[in-house]
């Protein structure tokens, strides 16, 4: 076996970089939702695990501790859903050639 062609290796590196840019764009497009307290708190996050929206039922605003607990539960629910959808999308983008969990970890989005 001969040495790998340097030109081919550089092309593969460039293609991997382009795939990562595609992954970043796809993650921004993913929107996941979470709610808690029977819908009293609703949130949405994107695939890059950024909070997009937060809705709190005004009727519960006088109970700060409950609101805090519900916000945390809703955000965590949405983040879990976003991570699941992100992994599914990454499998599509990479054609199964790369481990989605490793990609998310490299993007500082994995656990």
Curated annotation (Swiss-Prot):
Superkingdom of this protein's organism: Bacteria
Keyword Magnesium in record: no
Any one Gene Ontology cellular component term annotated for this protein: bacterial nucleoid
Location(s) in or outside the cell: Cytoplasm, Nucleoid
GO molecular function annotations of the record: DNA binding
Signal sequence extent: none
InterPro entries per the UniProt record, alphabetical: YbaB-like_sf, YbaB/EbfC
UniProtKB keywords: Cytoplasm, DNA-binding
Keyword RNA-binding applies: no
Pfam family, any one: YbaB_DNA_bd
Subunit structure of this chain's protein: Homodimer.
HAMAP family listed in its UniProt record: DNA_YbaB_EbfC
Family under the similarity heading: Belongs to the YbaB/EbfC family.
Physiological role: Binds to DNA and alters its conformation. May be involved in regulation of gene expression, nucleoid organization and DNA protection.
Protein name per Swiss-Prot or TrEMBL: Nucleoid-associated protein Cpha266_1171
Organism from which the protein derives: Chlorobium phaeobacteroides (strain DSM 266 / SMG 266 / 2430)
